[in-house]
Amino acid sequence: MALTLQVKNELATVPVQKLCCRRSEIAATLRFAGGIHLVQHRHLTIEAEVDTGGAARRLRQSIQEVFGFDTDLVVVNGAGLHSNTRYLIRMVRGGADLARLTGLLDRRGRPVRGLPVPIVGGGRCCQAAAWRGAFLARGSLTEPGRSMAMEITAPGEEAAMALVGAARRLDITAKQRESRHVDRVTIRDGDAISAMLTRMGAHESVLAWEDRRLRREVRASANRLANFDDANLRRSARAAVTASARVERALEILGDSVPDHLRAAGRLRLEHRNASLEELGKVHEPPLTKDAIAGRIRRLLALADKTARSNGEPTTLESLPVEMRDDRG
């Protein structure tokens, strides 16, 4: 299965409990998949075109559950140059109301050119939800390699720059560029792509991405290839992804209360996902031993798990998909 389709299929099933995140995802999907249209210069309609059935079902269900509006679905079978099936979600009656509720219209009734205010002013969870919606609408992910990239096709420069800002809020570097009069937002760094997949909730896709990425890196080096077999590669990739996902969850649980020295260790784990503990210790300022950096990460996870249990929330391990819980490295 192509990586893009795998990611979109997984994102279409990510459970989201917080209302603000569901609103942000809906708004971003509508903004990047189509948006507002005027019919006969009078009637405002909402239209969104996506390329997977899962994304279409998720958007329709979310709009109904969050805002109480029903939408129409038109399936456009591919033909000629456009061979892929497309799914058009349309709302004619009540379109203006939905546009205002999602922030696609500002207070004066004008279309928003960037991202809606609730997303821009929302927390990190809303920024991740916006990226999830944008990817479901117009995202793609290429195979690991020299030209690897996660890319979102944007409806305009303002929307592209707003999405770059959302990534920055997530500590991920994304860049806006124009190609053939089309605005795009691109993430090219391999670790940053893994981080964004994790933040969007595509945990299984992260495993596939890291597995393919690590395999390619090893094939490029005869010495490294001699030191690893396939089982070790998979185990190493899965353990690195699992550790990073747990650290990411730990930092979310603790928020501003995490001690600085534990936060620094956690950030290093996220910034250098494939690095060994010894390598992490060397890039720490000041340098730490392998045991010292490992101890700080263990204390970070233990503190987060204790806090989560006291708050009745899933721990860093319980928040992982079942298939990842045995890959703790």
Swiss-Prot record:
DNA-binding region: 276-309
Nucleotide-binding among keywords: no
InterPro entries hit by this protein: Homing_endonucl, Sporu_reg_WhiA_N_dom, Sporulation_regulator_WhiA, Sporulation_regulator_WhiA_C, WhiA_LAGLIDADG_dom
UniProt feature, compositional bias: Polar residues: 309-318
Protein name: Probable cell division protein WhiA
Spans traversing the lipid bilayer: none
UniProt keyword annotation of Ribosomal protein present: no
Keywords of this entry: Cell cycle, Cell division, DNA-binding
Family: Belongs to the WhiA family.
Gene name linked to the record: whiA
Domain of life: Bacteria
Region (Disordered): 308-329
Role, per record: Involved in cell division and chromosome segregation.
Example of a GO MF term: DNA binding
One Pfam match: HTH_WhiA
UniProt record, GO biological process: cell division; regulation of sporulation
